[in-house]
Amino acid sequence: MFGFTARGPLWFRILKGGTIFAKNYKTVLMLLALTAGALLIHGYHAFAEDAEIYLPGVEKILHPELFPAGQEFFGSHANLTLFPNLTVFWLRVLHLPFEAGLFLGHVLSIFFFLLACWELSAQCSPDARTRWAGVALVAALLTLPVAGTDLYILDQYLNPRNLSAFACVFAVTRVLKKQYLWAGLWLAFALSVHPLMPMYTISFCLLLVAMERFEGRAEPKAPVVGSTLAVACLVPLGALLGPPTPAYHQAVQFHSAHYILRWAWYEWAGVLAPLALLWWFASIARARQWRAVERLSLALVVYDLVYFAAALLLSIPKSFEALARLQPMRSLHLLYILMFLMAGILLGEYVLRSRIWRWLLLFVPLSLGMFAAQRALFPASAHIEFPETAPKNPWAQAFLWIRKNTPENAIFALDPYYMRIRGEDAVGFRCRAERSRTVDVNKDSGAVSMFPPLAEEWWEQLQALRGWKSFQKADFLRIKERYGVSWTVLQQPGVAGLECPYQNREVQVCRLP
């Protein structure tokens, strides 16, 4: 009744080994090849971007003496997810060094994500060639920006979203197969590592079930299902109502992704263009009697429209400013995964077929373009930052020196805009240096946008750092007295009167007197 079979899903049967593995070894090898290709195209940066939010929670469990100050800005996320605990468990059980464990975890997250796409493709097409076209297209586009959401399909480093992503795709497959217990288990795992992203998948799975239930009835099903989904989306809003404070308002100004009315025109296109594309997919699938593609496409149209309406609702009235942290347009993450998987399947069926030159004509330029985009995004860093290798980036070099040569309880002052400095490549200080720091406008403001009680502390400290570019020795002594700061990281040429035991061409690490 619940779809819990003795055989289980493909991933479970593969892991069991034996004859099942023998029957699927070609699939496994192909998925491994695509995983390696995805790594080569999109790169790997363990300590970049949102790793600054997620990895300090792992490091805090491994070394409780770390981060005597500012831990609330990453602990607010860490306390809502099992990601730090699962990562520590993974490292300890396998006796892996920290960086090696992160790298292996990232590679496996790509593999399981592509495996999930492969399983879902089986519901869309019976032909292996077209299925591989779909999976390959997704693999080539892993770091494609999802409209204006500040998300990629899959990030270039291990984080909860990557784990949630493959679990959510597995869940959608189970719903299509009416294996609801398996779907529930996958969604439970996804929720345990990321409390927000799976909520969109849950709503989509409910939508799939509801649309099938209404199928064949006289009533117009889409408005009924859409209204039901909208109500489900708005249920948690009551707990979040409350006027935003001035400090909170300042924090969310750094996160235009939360407010669709601030998006650029091409980001709006990333919301509206899929509607036409998915409707077209549904018409093609109907003619071919590809039932799953038709169901997914029509459901995604309703799904997109409902969340688009919710995003507009939360963006227009100022009184709803604090509710924008629900980020309805993050629903596009699942939509993009499914849309590009189906697009690849249709390309494989109608365009690529068995013509090798057509496959090369599509995937070679596409892969080179995605590779070039990543090099432009991380120009001062190695494309794949392998574990335990010396960093190429001067900022990462300075952060690594700090980790090895400064007291674990040291508190550092940094430019609150340091992650936006050209050549810094969005390397996180906390996660790379494993030291406390003053607040920033990139990641700590993100924590504030999700957890409003942090706003006053963040804003007060940010005000104390105002005018950083013109700071002199007296200014550093002032913030030392106020916040216990004992070190600072400065761009060259630095500030006169400070002792700086480490310097490179871009950065100085200075001890405050």
Region locations from a protein language model:
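Start-transfer (signal-anchor) and selected internal transmembrane alpha helices
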Residues: 1-37
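Active-site lumenal/periplasmic loops and adjacent helix-entry segments of GT-C-fold
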Residues: 34-114, 120-138, 145-164, 192-199
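Transmembrane catalytic cores of multi-pass membrane glycosyltransferases
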Residues: 39-52, 62-80, 195-201, 210-336
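Membrane-interface transmembrane helices that cradle and orient dolichyl/undecaprenyl
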Residues: 163-182, 214-215
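Membrane-interface alpha helices of multi-pass inner-membrane proteins
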Residues: 172-174, 181-195, 201-206, 228-232
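Hydrophobic/aromatic-rich transmembrane helices and adjacent perimembrane loops
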Residues: 322-350, 359-362
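Signature aromatic-anchored transmembrane alpha helix within multi-pass, membrane-resident enzymes
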Residues: 349-378
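Extracytoplasmic
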Residues: 377-513
